[in-house]
Structures are given as C-alpha cells and as structure tokens.
Curated annotation (Swiss-Prot):
Compartments in which it is found: Cytoplasm
Residue numbers annotated as active site: D8, D129
Protein name as catalogued: 1-(5-phosphoribosyl)-5-[(5-phosphoribosylamino)methylideneamino] imidazole-4-carboxamide isomerase
Family annotation (InterPro entries): Aldolase_TIM, His_biosynth, HisA_bact_arch, Isoase_HisA-like, Isoase_HisA-like_bact, RibuloseP-bd_barrel
Annotated GO MF terms: 1-(5-phosphoribosyl)-5-[(5-phosphoribosylamino)methylideneamino]imidazole-4-carboxamide isomerase activity
Entry GO terms, CC: cytoplasm
Keywords on record: Amino-acid biosynthesis, Cytoplasm, Histidine biosynthesis, Isomerase
Family statement: Belongs to the HisA/HisF family.
Amino acid sequence: MLVIPAIDLMGGEAVRLEKGDFATKTVYARHPAEKAEEFARAGATLLHVVDLDGAKAGWPVNLDAVRAICEVPGIEVELGGGLRSLPDIEKVLALGVRYVVLGTAAVERLGLVEQACQRFPGQVRAGIDARNGEVKIAGWLEGTGLAAVDVARKVKGAGVGLVEYTDVARDGMFTGVDAAGAARIQAEAGIPVVASGGVASLDDVTACRAAGLAGVIVGKALYERRIDLAAAIRAAAA
C-alpha cells in the first residue's frame, strides 16, 4: 500500500487547512519543493499536490510551484485543484505532473472525464470529497446532494482507474482516517481507493492497509511531526 505525502499550495506556499476552511490557513513551507525533497528522501515515491487557489478559481494557479516540485528527482507528482478543461490538464502534464486528480469535473462534467481518460490513458484519477456522506465540490465549498459511492461508480464507468476519497470533516483534525468508509466505496464501486483526511498516527496507516486500500494520503500529521514518513512507509509495507 502506498503512503502518499501531501502538499497543499496557496500563494506559492505549502499550507494546511482545517476541514477545508480557507480561513484556517497555516503556512508550513515558503518553498514547497524543499518539502518534496524531504519526502523523497524519506522514501515516498508519489506526492499528492493540491492547488487550493486553483480549486477556488476553477483553473490552475500555482504553476511555478508545481513546476519546481515536479523537478525534484525520485518522486512522482499527482495534482488536483482547478483542473476543469482538457487544455489545463494538458498544461500541467507538460510540467511533469504524472497524474491529474479531477474533483469538481468528476461530478459536473463526466464527459470531460471520459475525454481526459481517452486522451491521457492511465493518468486520470478522481478526487471524491465528502462531508457527512455528501460529495462536496469547488474547493469543498459547494454541496451536491450526491453520495460518494455513486460518484465513484460513475467515474469508473468513464474510465478512471483510481479514486481518492477525502472525509472533509476529518481533514486536518487528527480525528482518524475513515478507512471503513473508503473500503466500502472500494468494494461497492469496484475501484481502487486511496483514503485521505484525519490521519493522526501510524494506527491510521495500518488500518488502511488492513482494509485493503490502495493507499493513504498523509498531510498535516507529517507537518506537525505526529508521524514519521519513513516509519509510515515501512508500516504500509509490513
């Protein structure tokens, strides 16, 4: 199982939010690429990057920071946030991004998801963010009335090969990851799922591994030094 460290970008800096609330920003690194280097040294092979400004704007914003992160050797990058057109997807892939994570587009523009999967096979993932079971979009600011498992089924039908599921209510709160909810989506939709949101300790990593998930995304727990990344990677492989 993969342990995927996260970098959230705002104003070119690495930040973290609580429950996706833009008013709770904490800056952790002025130069996000240095964080990427640190994670690569610890043994991570994939980095989860979110362009928070892009998620609000509807198009990629932090391109300079993304480019710098992609230039870090030894670690691949997946990027989400504001990717809602084929030209924007193409633009970030050209920067060196390995996978794109479509969130709002996965809900509102399934046709775009299908086109992206056909044009960039194997490089398109879906980010499904939910609060109390309801999928949220536009940087978690808008509700949809849709259930996460239903969206997962639809994106699988569109050609997506993996879903990244975030419990927004847990994100940045150290309340424990929703491994059971992620496993339920994986089983019912028949698609590999990576869990995110609320990871607080190595117990969360082992819970995701025990649930048979494809991976777990770890963010604030790394920045607050609650989890040692190298130890988490070892726990996921045990």
